């Protein structure tokens, strides 16, 4: 499906902006956007880069913040910041559940379950994906940690493929089922072929309102009914 030209075009959209946020659709130059509704001024987006390269100048990172001492790769750094977003997400849904239960409506308990359902779905999906290695999320902790045969593991102790899948699904979870555009650059890197095949469906399970724009060299990523959504780079470049 190609990569280089698509990513270059994508960079026109997100150049100079931090990953994850909003940008004004009417201020972009050289990129034509079609938005819905037509008068939309802002677009929420996330960008996921999948390569697990060593952190540049690791000593400087550790001196900057001692809590970063466990981080060795770019995926570790992404997970560190996603953990912070995950804590905020849990506070947010907790406050919504409390407000719902205090409202006194007869369906308050069902609504509270609906609010908390995406988090449980995320945990169930991760447990299923990691089941072959016996890892399960510890659901009593606020930060994401895993249990494996009685040992507690941090996300930074996962394999590259496990970290990558966790980054993707955690990014989608904290979008809180809001409309987002999710850019992904070769998400199949380090992922087992079965995970590649399930990836898009897993993302849409957590956020049905996300629009996915990705580049890939793997047929498995689009094998599950997405072949008709593929654009060849050669068809859109000179």
What are these regions (language model features)?
Residues 124, 133, 138-238:
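Switch/communication elements of ASCE P-loop NTPase nucleotide-binding domains
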Residues 2, 43, 179:
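Conserved catalytic motifs of the protein kinase core domain
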Residues 8-99:
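Non-catalytic, alpha-helical, charged scaffold/linker segments
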Residues 17, 31-35, 122-130, 203:
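Hydrophobic, Leu/Ile/Phe/Ala-enriched alpha-helical segments that form helix-helix packing faces
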Residues 87-157, 173:
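Extended helical coiled-coil dimerization/tether regions that scaffold
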Residues 1-7:
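Short, small-residue-biased leader/transition segments that mark boundaries at the very start
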């Amino acid at each position: 499906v190609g990569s280089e030209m698509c990513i270059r075009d994508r960079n026109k959209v997100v150049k100079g902006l931090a990953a994850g946020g909003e940008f004004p659709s009417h201020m972009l130059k050289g990129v034509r956007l079609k938005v819905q509704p037509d008068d939309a001024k802002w677009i929420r987006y996330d960008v996921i880069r999948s390569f697990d390269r060593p952190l540049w100048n690791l000593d400087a990172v550790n001196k900057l913040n001692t809590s970063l001492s466990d981080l060795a790769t770019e995926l570790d750094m992404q997970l560190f910041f996603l953990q912070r977003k995950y804590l905020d997400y849990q506070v947010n849904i907790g406050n919504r559940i409390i407000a719902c239960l205090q409202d006194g409506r007869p369906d308050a308990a069902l609504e509270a379950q609906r609010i908390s359902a995406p988090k449980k779905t995320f945990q169930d999906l991760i447990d299923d994906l990691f089941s072959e290695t016996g890892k399960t999320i510890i659901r009593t902790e606020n930060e994401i940690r895993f249990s494996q045969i009685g040992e507690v593991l941090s996300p930074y102790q996962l394999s590259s493929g496990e970290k990558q899948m966790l980054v993707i699904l955690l990014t989608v979870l904290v979008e809180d089922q809001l409309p987002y555009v999710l850019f992904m650059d070769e998400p199949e890197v380090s992922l087992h072929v079965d995970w590649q095949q399930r990836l898009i469906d897993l993302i849409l399970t957590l956020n049905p309102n996300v629009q996915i724009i990705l580049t890939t060299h793997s047929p498995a990523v689009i094998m599950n009914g997405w072949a008709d959504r593929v654009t060849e780079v050669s068809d859109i470049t000179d």
